[in-house]
Amino acid sequence: MRSRKVLILAVAFAFTLSTLTPANADNPPRRILSGWLPDYSLARNLPTVEGNLDLIRDISPFWYGLTGETSIKDKYALGKYTTPIEQVISRLKANNLILLPTITDDNPKLVLANLLANPSSRTNIVQTIKALVLKYNYDGIDLDFETFYTQDGRSSWATLKPNWIAFIKELSTALHDQGKLLSVTTP
């Protein structure tokens, strides 16, 4: 009986090894990178993105900042670019890039923490972000909310954590229901 179990295990192990694809230095796996597009010098940075399309799958331009429960600062407009944002969006999409603009937390200390603690305010933020994504038909959004960590202090995280998780769940559901993506950068 024992030799039978050993035989079965040996055959299973041999089968597993035979189905593995060996590494091949001549054909390394393709790297797929996500990149952020800084909100300065678009004229210089956009051609850099376009020159690396074989590497980049999705791009997150720093174009927005959450400034309140229902308000988002348009950093692209504030940058005084001469090219309308719609043309830049078309150019990025024409290159088959997944467009996930970055939205930062541009609120003063403890503002976001207080907003996320209120379910009604949290829902308003979700709806405001979703409306932005739908307005420009973005593929989704990239959250880069770090102010609560850097300005509010690490000790605030214990209180904020359950509200942050509820916010991420609510936003991801709202976006996924529209076929949109959510990328989250957190400290």
Label for each model-derived stretch:
Residues 19-27:
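Sec-dependent signal peptide cleavage junction
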Residues 26-131:
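Glycan-recognition patch characteristic of GH18 chitinases/ENGases
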Residues 30-38, 165-187:
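Aromatic-lined carbohydrate-recognition surfaces of secreted/lumenal glycan-active proteins
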Residues 1-8:
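Bacterial N-terminal signal peptides that target proteins for export
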Residues 117-141, 163, 167-170, 174:
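An active-site-proximal structural segment forming one wall of the substrate-binding cleft
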Residues 95, 136, 177-179:
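Helix C-cap/helix->beta junction micro-motif
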Residues 10-18:
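Bacterial N-terminal signal peptides
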Residues 63, 126-159:
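Active-site groove signature of glycoside hydrolases
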